[in-house]
Curated annotation (Swiss-Prot):
Family: Belongs to the Rho family.
Classification of source organism: Bacteria, Pseudomonadati, Pseudomonadota, Gammaproteobacteria, Pseudomonadales
Protein name: Transcription termination factor Rho
Disulphide-bonded residues: none
One GO MF term: RNA binding
GO cellular component, one term: cytosol
Gene this chain is encoded by: rho
Subunit architecture: Homohexamer. The homohexamer assembles into an open ring structure.
Length: 419
């Protein structure tokens, strides 16, 4: 019996299973309580149960395996991990653990971890001699992540425009600057599907902070990756806890030389949550931002890096502008210089219903010569020289019009050469 498989089943199927096993009055229970009751029943019959989750170590020294399906929220189906196991395997918050579990004994409330089978998708003995994330050497991104699918569809236009004006590499720290209703959510969906298609070796996590519940559902259905969310009706402490769990998980995977991509929507809302949660220092910046409030969101964003020893952590975060809030402007200004790739979306272009609404002249990647070939770089510069005299709207319209006539960017460059 596997705990994760049960969590992925719809509630109707779980109720049928509980009826078949003779469990009564389950119809009005929460999903986690139904799973808890089912596993307890299975364990009584002597079956082996396996479970997995991401470790969160509490101040008392013990920890719990939280589930990504419930966005790392504490629940009755969490798995208890004892302090002795944490010391023995040198575990830290964010480690992904798979192992055998046992049902709670008399007076216990949680399932407990019996045996560790794997840590961060690797053998437990390999986890002991890994280097800490803080001690790894950061580099500029030097391995390209292509965004174009090459099928010539209209959905592929976003990826192709990004490839032309702001190429993304493994370990990029990118900021998507977006006014309201400029199509940032659709753009993130496109980027997510292109990453899973072109770079299946990357572990993708989409982190939605303070978003609408219907957008979370849509993202879960369109993205073939892990979607972790804290909707706008949750308290700010919850936003902060979710973000910390995600970044810790990503760091632990990078320590095992994995490539991780986090798409964050949005860093502005995360900074607002931290501003509410941290104790007041008495120093307040314009717009009501506490002087120390942005330290942790900066630490989150600054974790993105390409690692010399192997592995990388890429973070693409959206920053909200033109919302009419002074606080949002201050937060954006603080993050403006920290990224090494910027992709501004333009409200005027979006109002004309031209998508993707990217402002090409202002977008770009630092040290893009490390990601592109000499020949491609020259072509991209020539394209910028052609588009620069135009205003934002006519530049993107001209580019989209020309891109629609070809299937791939290479074909587009060849047609440019002929002209």
């Amino acid at each position: 019996m596997n705990l994760t498989e049960l969590k992925q089943k719809p509630i109707a199927e779980l109720l049928e299973m509980s009826d078949a096993m003779g469990l009564e009055n389950m119809a009005r229970s929460r999903k986690q309580d139904i799973i808890f009751a089912l596993l307890k029943k299975h364990a009584k019959s002597g079956e082996e149960i396996s479970g997995d989750g991401v470790l969160e170590i509490l101040q008392d020294g013990f920890g719990f395996l939280r589930s990504a399906d419930s966005s790392y929220l504490a629940g009755p189906d969490d798995i208890y991990v004892s302090p002795s196991q944490i010391r023995r395997f040198n575990l830290r918050t964010g480690d992904t653990i798979i192992g055998k579990i046992r049902p709670p004994k008399e007076g216990e409330r949680y399932f407990a971890l019996l045996k560790v089978d794997s840590i961060n998708f690797d053998r437990p003995e390999n986890a002991k001699n890994k280097i800490l994330f803080e001690n790894l050497t950061p580099l500029f991104p030097n391995e390209r992540m292509k965004m174009e699918a090459g099928n010539g569809s209209t959905e592929d236009l976003t990826g192709r425009v990004i490839d032309l004006c702001a190429p993304i590499g493994k370990g990029q720290r990118g900021l998507i600057v977006a006014p309201p209703k400029a199509g940032k959510t659709i753009m993130l969906q496109n980027i997510a599907s292109n990453i899973t298609r072109n770079n299946p070796e990357c572990h993708l996590i989409v982190l939605l902070i303070d978003e609408r519940p219907e957008e979370v559902t849509e993202m879960q259905r369109t993205v073939r990756g892990e979607v972790v969310a804290s909707t706008f009706d949750e308290p700010p402490t919850r936003h902060v806890q979710v973000a910390e769990m995600v970044i810790e998980k990503a760091k632990r995977l990078v320590e095992h030389k994995k490539d991780v991509v986090i798409l964050l929507d949005s860093i502005t809302r995360l900074a607002r949550a931290y501003n509410t949660v941290i104790p007041s220092s008495g120093k307040v910046l314009t717009g009501g931002v506490d002087a120390h409030a942005l330290e942790k969101p900066k630490r989150f964003f600054g974790a993105a890096r390409n690692i010399e020893e192997g592995g990388s952590l890429t973070i693409l975060a959206t920053a909200l502008v033109e919302t009419g809030s002074k606080m949002d402007e201050v937060i954006y200004e603080e993050f403006k210089g920290t990224g090494n790739m910027e992709l501004p979306l333009d409200r005027k272009i979006a109002e004309k219903r031209v998508f993707p609404a990217i402002n090409i002249n202002r977008s770009g990647t630092r040290r893009e010569e490390l990601l592109t070939s000499e020949d491609e770089l020259q072509r991209m510069w020539i394209l910028r020289k052609i588009l620069h005299p135009m205003d934002e709207i006519s530049a993107i319209e001209f580019l989209i019009d020309k891109l629609k006539q070809t299937k791939t960017n290479d074909e587009f460059f060849d047609s440019m050469k002929r002209k």
